[in-house]
């Protein structure tokens, strides 16, 4: 997938330029992402029904994972790109350069954190194994490739790194608030009941630093490419 031509750095575009290869690639990625998300939702909800927790509890647990929310974010972006120039204004909002970048930063770190921190304690089988591969190992690199191909040179400002951080920051607030009310935490490094607030907040701070650094790196890649800085 070749990268689009250089655009002026001084006036970042609100809309990306979509050609047929990009549209087809985005469509394939959207199908992969939505299929994995739907299959994983079916597995997760039915597991909790079988345990006697009910479907609503299953949905709550399913939507508590950053992996799920980030893959849904990426699937929305990919769908918006796949719809092409005729997409509505609402869909075009999802494919603005800052939104694509925010999704790319988060999905990259989803893959990295899972591989290094969670893989050893997670052992899915059957269909769930296939979903796990898609959500943690296929979508992350493919979406970063989509980001590289879709976001033009000079399309980002430094403040877009803050946009990229807003999503995981909001998730952290959600996780701790939900945990305080429901007593459940999706990840061991956030589990206040087991490691305490001090360790959980320290882990959140460490991940925040990672998100900020990666966000600035993504912006720098596109800004630097435009001007040679």
Where are these regions (language model features)?
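N-terminal membrane topogenic signal
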Residues: 13-29
